[in-house]
Amino acid sequence: MAQTTFSGPVKSLAGFISAGVSNSVTTAAGKTLTVANDAGKQIYYTSTATATFTLPTVNASSPSDPTDPNQSNNFGATFEFVLSTTVTGSFIVKVNSSNDTVVGTAIIGEGTTSMAVFSTATASDTITLNGTTTGGVGGANVKATVVGANRYKVEVVSGATGALATPFSATV
């Protein structure tokens, strides 16, 4: 199969493998994410300060032509975050719309002595890693994928310190 190189964002209706220097974005500040600019990229957070990353509103509209690459449905859009260092403020990932929620789990480990798995509550819409009890140690990973109407599936893996606590809440 021939190989094609694109310099701008590509929207695939059947998935693809992305690799290259533009697939990882380094930032020291939070932002409101978009599907066109941020989906499918690894966001490498390099600051210890508080930052908020706001996920795009889930768009579940059914296209009249499911093969149209310009459809607005964003099912399958994935946003991945990696912390380069332990945060001293709060690293926050939240939904943009009060209609959207997150479902998933967080695996938080404290040194070699304890580990906990936290599940989202029905109304969860925010992930907060505080650098201590809810995670946020360097190397932490947060992944959010649009999986259905008003729903993101989330996965959190992080080290922590102190008495472990859930990173999930309802704040939007």
Regions found by a protein language model. Give the residues of each.
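Short solvent-exposed loop/turn micro-motifs enriched in small/polar/acidic residues
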Residues: Q3, G135-G138
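Short, P/G- and charge-enriched loop/turn segments at secondary-structure junctions
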Residues: T126-T132
